[in-house]
Amino acid sequence: MVGHSESSTDAVIEPTSEELLAEQVRVFNKMKGSTNFNRVAEDVYPVEVTKSKLVCEMVVQHQHLNSKGTLHGGQTATLTDVITARAVGVTVKDKGMASVELAVSYLLPVKVGDVLEITAHVLKVGRTMAFTDCEFRRKSDGKMSAKGKHTLAFLPNQPGISVENGTQF
């Protein structure tokens, strides 16, 4: 329509990066002291968030290690699952999710005291699925220690993620 202008009530207000980060900090704080399997992410702290990327950090501690004294592969796989799902959850808030595929390649060892920077990228969000990848880097030298990929299906008639009540956490 010529001469038509949208009213300010029609405009969608996008959250700021600070608001997105604050939301993810609240979500990860809910994992602290969790009694379910998400407790493996209780030492993870979000540091940067966009609609397509979530960057977190974690200091590797003794409870994260395998018998050889390096970061346990199961810990890395679970963090790939949790952090990539949270990256999708930044924009997909009205749907439950389930893993369809999860794969991790382990490249270098990580030891106690190492700080990991974990970056999850949302590659594509479709009508029924989302595709992500994840990189684990040692902050001390920037070298990649692991690379993961995670495909998620959106569940019909399931609750979405709620920061307030910790649904799916």
From Swiss-Prot:
Q: Does the keyword Hydrolase apply?
A: yes
Is Hydrolase one of the keywords?
yes
Provide any one GO MF term from the record.
Answer: fatty acyl-CoA hydrolase activity
Q: Which InterPro entries match?
A: ACOT13 (IPR039298), HotDog_dom_sf (IPR029069), PAAI_dom (IPR003736), Thioestr_dom (IPR006683)
The EC number(s) given in the record are 3.1.2.-
Instruction: Please report a single Pfam family linked to this protein.
Output: 4HBT
Per UniProt, the keywords (alphabetical) are: Hydrolase
Per UniProt, the enzyme's principal EC class comes to hydrolase
List the PANTHER family.
ACYL-COENZYME A THIOESTERASE 13, THIOESTERASE SUPERFAMILY MEMBER-RELATED
Q: Which family does it belong to?
A: Belongs to the thioesterase paaI family.
Do you know which NCBIfam families this protein is assigned to? unchar_dom_1 (TIGR00369)
What is the protein name for this chain? Putative esterase F42H10.6
